[in-house]
């Protein structure tokens, strides 16, 4: 059981990292700073940084907000997640 829990934790970390990579990639493609994305999504710049590095798990509503601001389909952000 402990091994399966470790696998699940590792899988979640990889998925969060991939989500963060996708968000950062789209943000940079739009030439937005973390600060500007934070302003437009009403979250802190630190939270944007933590999301982009996979250190926190944003709510689905926050991911939808980010997708809207970046003008991309949410599926682009959750690709390979």
List each model region and its residues.
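Short C-terminal boundary/hinge segments that cap the last helix of small helical domains
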Residues: 71-81
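Recognition helix of helix-turn-helix/homeodomain-like DNA-binding domains
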Residues: 42-56
């Amino acid at each position: 059981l402990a091994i399966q829990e470790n696998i699940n934790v590792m899988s979640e970390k990889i998925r969060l990292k991939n989500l963060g990579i996708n968000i950062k990639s789209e943000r940079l493609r739009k030439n937005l700073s973390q600060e500007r994305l934070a302003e437009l999504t009403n979250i802190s710049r630190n939270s944007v940084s933590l999301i982009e590095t996979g250190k926190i798990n944003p709510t689905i509503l926050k991911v939808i907000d980010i997708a809207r601001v970046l003008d991309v389909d949410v599926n682009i952000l959750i690709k390979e997640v």
